């Protein structure tokens, strides 16, 4: 199968996968979410004692490729040299981004987590990154390393740039409308999909809400 050559990301539903929690059932949930319209998958840098990192990443790439969905690596950029993954998500600004891009040797998607720090937004703009993500907008057990982000911060970032903005942390279909006025383009979620009885329905619901925002 050919690699995805479309190294862009525009918004939508962005699934963050915890590799330490993957089971056979997890892959089925991911497949159902892909069928319902994921825009990207990120492999979170939470490996615990797992050593077969490249194998897991490539399995996810193989799962996502038929749907044209890119797979991004959180922090462990070396895995892009061992797999067909499509990009990197940084937790913090890197002084070595130009060297990393050169070492990988192909077009990649790059994104970064922002908290309440507009300097990180400016860094993403200066480095011509493809998207930014704000964490955490609501309380979340999986985003407990993030500070809570004020809606005004996201709105300020929207005024600074047109690159896609995602929000993460405790987002559900019920509370997503509360943060839509900030101008975000997508949501990054873990448990809302991975712990759902019907991940396809959850993905569809998120996409429907985001699409309604675009038409208003």
What are these regions (language model features)?
Residues 1-95, 102-130, 156, 162-163, ...:
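Conserved N-terminal beta1-alpha1 strand-loop-helix module at the mouth
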Residues 92-98, 137-160:
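Flexible, gly/pro- and Lys/Arg-enriched active-site loops
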Residues 113, 137, 143, 171-172, ...:
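Gly/Ser/Thr-rich beta-alpha loop segments that engage phosphate groups in nucleotides
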Residues 130, 142, 164, 186-187:
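Preference for short coil/turn "hinge" residues that link or interrupt alpha-helices
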């Amino acid at each position: 199968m050919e690699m995805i050559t479309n190294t862009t990301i525009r918004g939508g539903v962005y699934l963050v996968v915890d590799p330490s929690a993957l089971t056979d059932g997890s892959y089925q949930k991911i497949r159902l979410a892909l069928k319902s319209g994921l825009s990207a998958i990120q492999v979170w840098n939470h490996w615990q004692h797992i050593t077969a990192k490249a194998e897991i990443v490539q399995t996810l790439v193989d799962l996502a490729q038929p749907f044209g969905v890119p797979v991004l690596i959180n922090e462990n950029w070396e895995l892009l040299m061992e797999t067909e993954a499509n990009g990197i998500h940084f937790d913090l600004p890197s002084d070595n981004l130009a060297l990393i891009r050169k070492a990988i040797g192909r077009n990649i998607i790059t994104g970064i987590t922002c908290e309440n720090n507009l300097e990180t937004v400016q860094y993403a703009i200066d480095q011509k990154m493809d998207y930014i993500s704000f964490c955490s907008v609501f309380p979340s057990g999986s985003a407990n390393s993030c500070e809570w982000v004020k809606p005004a911060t996201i709105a300020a970032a929207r005024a600074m740039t047109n690159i896609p903005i995602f929000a993460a942390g405790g987002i559900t279909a019920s509370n997503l409308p509360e943060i839509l006025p900030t101008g975000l383009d997508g949501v990054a979620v873990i448990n809302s999909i991975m712990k759902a009885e019907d991940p396809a329905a959850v993905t569809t619901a998120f996409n429907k809400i985001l699409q309604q925002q675009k038409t208003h």
